[in-house]
């Protein structure tokens, strides 16, 4: 569901900026193909175990280049491959479409994490600081709509994809809140440890069998 939401947000932004919607959607649909079970928790444990480390964006590129179609790969164009690789990490994609997916991914995952935390009883709607909600919206749909429209308006006529200062600052504050209230929450950390232990055990099993 995360990938489909990223694709929907990214395509909406691309349409609003009169950019290549198909290229944007292709990057979005491929961006997390190499992700581990349990998301970033799984990625961290594989990064510790594997001699060369592990990055899910690099694995996503490996999936489309080397693993699909029984090793033949999908023969994707440079722009799609580069967008997949650069949706996270220090390097930005050269295309605006690739940059759109990068920001759409951030919009989607933080809102998805909020929903998960609320379903798990870790946080409640009124826990989100009021100054953040007044800028971004008070529910999932409101935040998605606000952030999507903001990227379109802030990026129109520019040579890069960006957010307005107000929404960028609110997003940064929201991330800080999520780290304090959710990501470092003892309940969430306990579940993360279970997930990491499971992946480590599976890795050891497949290595020895």
Describe every region a protein language model picked out.
Residues 23-49, 57:
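Aspartate-rich (DDxxD/NDxxD/DxxxD) Mg2+/diphosphate-binding motifs
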Residues 3-5, 42-43:
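Active/ligand-binding-proximal structured segments within catalytic/core domains
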